[in-house]
Regions:
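Di-metal (Zn2+ and/or Mg2+/Mn2+) metal-binding site signature of metallo-dependent hydrolases
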Residues: 82-105
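Glycine-rich phosphate-binding loop of ATP-grasp-fold ATP-dependent ligases
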Residues: 166-176
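Histidine-rich, glycine-flanked metal-binding segment
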Residues: 3-23, 29-85
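Divalent metal-dependent hydrolysis catalytic cores, especially in the metallo-beta-lactamase
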Residues: 94, 109-141, 151-165, 191-196
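Histidine/acidic residue-rich metal-binding segments in metalloenzymes
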Residues: 177-196
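Alpha-helix-loop-beta-strand connector modules within alpha/beta enzyme cores
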Residues: 145-150, 187
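Extended beta-sheet lipid-handling architectures
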Residues: 24-25, 158
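Short, charged beta->alpha transition segments
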Residues: 79-80, 108-113, 183-187
Length: 196
């Protein structure tokens, strides 16, 4: 568990911190066009990819343009031939590593780290059916986490409470509601949206 806690701390710090230049070399790029070996990518201090390709001289040039020493093993990541793909975007997951996105800020940090280490760079956090006040609290927590500067969190997906009893699956029937304006307005207010 201590390894997992260390990963959570590192991932959370990286996501909350200021972007820094990053360079990755010696990767296998895999995308819709196929696979390329010896691939590299360089991003600047704003987190924007400035160049990508193959060829050592060009890699070194772009490293220097963003202030990285291409020989610095602490600044340049050697992918050692591992696959480099665009980051995954997950639009429906409830958590990871024994934590739910309904478990407050710490639960969000742990679950996001669990997804991030497997390549999910952005995520819509799915929240389960609960009493309306709990759902609203969870929406506010997701909103506050996003507003704290977490670019990896795109918003939240509510899996209820507006479900038909006949199709409720594992959802608590006591928490199911009709989508009446009062409840919808409360949820919109919790999200920061104007219910008008």
């Amino acid at each position: 568990m201590s390894d997992r806690n260390e990963i959570v701390s590192r991932v959370t710090a990286a996501l909350e911190g200021k972007p820094a230049p990053v360079a990755i070399r010696n990767a296998r790029k895999v995308d819709a066009r196929g696979e390329r070996r010896g691939y590299w990518v360089v991003s600047d201090a704003a987190g924007v990819i400035v160049a990508a390709g193959t060829g050592e001289e060009t890699f070194e040039h772009y490293c220097r343009t963003v202030g990285l020493d291409p020989a610095d093993r602490n600044a340049v990541i050697d992918a050692e031939g591992r696959i480099l793909t665009p980051g995954y975007v997950d639009i429906h997951a409830h958590g990871a590593w024994e934590k739910s996105f309904d478990d407050g800020p710490d639960g969000i940090d742990v679950a996001r780290a669990g997804h991030a280490v497997h390549g999910t760079t952005r995520q819509v956090l799915s929240l389960i059916t609960n009493p309306v006040d709990v759902i609203c609290r969870n929406i506010r927590t997701v909103r506050a986490t996003m507003e704290s500067g977490r670019p990896d969190i795109l918003g939240c997906h509510l899996e209820g409470p507006f479900l038909a009893l006949a199709r409720k699956g594992a959802h608590d029937p006591e928490c199911l509601k009709d989508p009446v304006p009062d409840i919808v307005d409360k949820m919109l207010e919790a999200s920061g949206a104007d219910p008008a």
